[in-house]
Amino acid sequence: MTPKYSALPRAVLFDMDGTLVDSTEMWFRAPDELVRQLGYEPKPSLYESTFPLGTMEIARFIHDDYHTRQSVEEVLSCLDARLYRYYAQEATLKPGGEALVRRLKATGVKLALTTATMERYARPALQCTGVDDLFDLVLTTDRAGCTKRDPEFFKTALRLLDVQPHEAWLFEDAAYSICTARALGLHTCGVADPGAEFDQPAVREAADCFLESLADWRKLPFADKL
């Protein structure tokens, strides 16, 4: 392990859904609840079909697959209302999440939320979970204008935080995002999530280290600095 690898980072970037916020169950339930709300019976394959999709894509899929009377825009409006209610009123952090971000902040580490979830949901989620005052930056893919497959997303985050890639860590549950960040020179920590078990082998292989839970933060290479 190199000294830089075990050094206290100047910045830590957190993915939101499945990494910092315990939202997997909500994303499992939301499409099912939406289909029932629209007056249809959910198919067993609904979650598998919608898991990798964004909100507009979910709305379009449900409209097309269930031939809904409601337009795509009306389906999206119903989905948006459900998601906003969750993030603004029901969201919780994953075990160990609050302790980790508070320790990082207490040592002077800059914190960023880097997420593919819309900013309309991300900021209320931080407020709902009581950690909004700890984050120096919220960068969403809709705000950045690119996905986390695009290196420009992480370049933007680093520029706004005023840190170099080797000075930053990314905590993430998606292998594709970890690969993008590592290619830029960021250190990466994979985080287990029940909703992304299919991706876990790739996450373990791609990341510098892996945590079964954020509560295991003492296993981090720089834990002795916290």
Regions found by a protein language model. Give the residues of each.
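Electropositive, surface-exposed helix/loop patches at the edges of structured domains
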Residues: 82-86, 110, 161, 224-226
